Amino acid sequence: KREVWDAMADQMRFWMEKGVDGFRCDMACEVPLEFWQETISALRADYPGMYMLAEGEEPKLHSLSGFNSSYAWELHHLLNAIARGEKNIPELLEYIQKDAERHPADAFRLMFTSNHDENSWAGTEFERMGDAAKLMAVLTFTLPGGQPLIYTGQEMGWNKRFEFFEKDHIPAWEKNEYF
């Protein structure tokens, strides 16, 4: 355990020394909190501006571990349900209040309508949200406490599933309704 923790911390320090300004940590909630507490604290001593994004939703990733931002997965699923007509604005307002109460005031919540997992496995935001996709994207940019995620091609309105484990062609930028 200690050897693995040290090796992981060494790799993070290596990349910080190369000029990386932070990390997105996959499945951060599955890594012991003690590792994050120790490692983030040690790295921030030398790199106080280091930015840490947790793929996870637990408030303790912020309050105990030192992550700046975490994925708002619950919001993502709620936006999909609203787009399908299964949930409504009262549930969104309840989520906003609950999320603000659960997370520290300085925690950024990564808000998104798509990402590499959702696009590959569940479909594009247009497939999942239909005509509501644009409105849901606006919400991810404007809800309180949020930090929007723009996934590959969203800035262009691409309605394409990208392969998860294969090389995939990125379409050329074309003039369209998004710019």
Name the predicted role of every residue range:
Residues 1, 18-20, 115-123, 166:
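Short glycine/proline-rich turn/loop motifs
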Residues 1-18, 28-29:
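Active-site-adjacent "subsite" loops/lids of carbohydrate-active enzymes
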Residues 3, 30-31, 127-131:
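Alpha-helix N-cap and loop-to-helix initiation/capping positions
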Residues 5-8, 36, 133:
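Aromatic/hydrophobic pocket-lining residues that form the small-molecule binding cavity
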Residues 11, 21, 26-109, 139-142, ...:
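Active-site-proximal helices and loops of the catalytic beta/alpha 8
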Residues 53-54, 145-152:
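Acidic/polar loop patches that form or flank catalytic/metal-binding clefts of enzymes
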Residues 103-128:
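Active-site clefts of carbohydrate-active enzymes
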